[in-house]
Design a protein with these regions (language model features):
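Surface-exposed binding patches on compact interaction domains or structured appendages
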Residues: 1-16, 83-117, 179-218
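Short, surface-exposed loop/turn segments at beta-strand-coil junctions that are enriched for proline
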Residues: 18-24, 120-126, 222-227
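Surface-exposed loop/turn motifs at beta-strand-loop junctions within extracellular Ig-like
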Residues: 19, 34-36, 50, 83, ...
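A short beta-strand micro-motif common to beta-rich folds, especially ectodomain repeats
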Residues: 24-36, 126-138, 228-235
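Extracellular and select intracellular beta-sandwich modules with Ser/Thr-enriched
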Residues: 39-47, 140-146
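Interdomain boundary/hinge segments at the C-termini of tandem beta-sandwich modules
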Residues: 46-54, 147-154
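Beta-sheet-dominated interaction scaffolds and their linkers
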Residues: 54-80, 154-181
Length: 235
């Protein structure tokens, strides 16, 4: 039989068998023939167990973390998913690919075609986090990729205008009012968010004969008995 050999000794025979590289049992026969005139023979059946077949599984994702811009974007990752066959603990052949699947968890994150993760725009003022969980189909191997996305960039555009830009008063004196637009517009990632919000303001009036009225948007001119007077209201 394949793999079997013998050696005669003083007490009989030593049977030697090489390692079985196959996945099936091997068999053989030892036949002993009588050399004298009797001519009798006897046979000994030989068996050898099949190889012990095991597999070493590997599952590695690269990179181990992905960071996304707050405006949203798509990023990819790579996966090495293989198994290495071993016979009796020894490597047999080359590693072969093993299928895998992945799931994405976390607000604003989702899976896309291929090994891609999509992050939608983050309009919140806090960082978002998530995780990709990769599972090998033939084993219990699992690997993960941590996900993070920057918080939204929040800015404000301020507006301050007056209407009209000049006031004329009669010599007898009078009070006049002017319009003021004072607000701020919130922007998230450079885009308007919500409606403008009013912003408080103060007014300082200068110039002889001119004073601030009862509101921040009024000016009082006292009676003028002399030459033309000028002043300024700074908002």
């Amino acid at each position: 039989g394949v793999g079997f050999s013998y050696e005669e000794t003083d007490n009989g025979y030593d049977i030697t068998v090489t390692e079985n590289p196959g996945e099936t049992q091997r068999t053989g026969t030892l036949t002993i023939n009588q050399t004298d005139e009797g001519g009798e023979s006897v046979s000994v059946n030989l068996t050898q167990a099949a190889s012990v077949v095991t597999y070493d599984y590997t599952l590695t994702a690269t990179p181990t973390s992905l960071s996304f811009a707050n405006t949203g974007e798509t990023k990819s990752f790579s996966v090495v998913s293989t198994k290495q066959k071993k016979l009796n603990g020894n490597v047999s052949g080359s590693a072969v690919d093993v299928a895998f699947s992945f799931e994405v968890a976390g607000s604003g994150f989702s899976k896309s075609t291929g090994n891609n993760v999509v992050a939608t725009e983050n309009t919140t003022e806090s960082e978002r986090t998530g995780v990709v969980t990769i599972t090998q189909s033939e084993s219990d191997e699992v690997d993960t990729i941590n996900l993070s996305q920057a918080a939204a960039t929040v800015t404000y555009d301020y507006t301050l205008t007056t209407d009209p830009t000049s006031l004329s008063f009669v010599a007898a004196g009078e009070t006049k009012v002017f319009g003021v637009t004072s607000n701020k517009q919130k922007k998230v990632n450079g885009k308007n968010s919500g409606s403008p919000i009013a912003v408080d303001y103060t007014t300082v009036v200068s110039g002889e004969g001119f004073t601030k009225g009862s509101s921040e948007y009024s000016v009082i001119a006292a009676a003028n008995t002399g030459a033309e007077r000028t002043g300024q209201a700074v908002v």
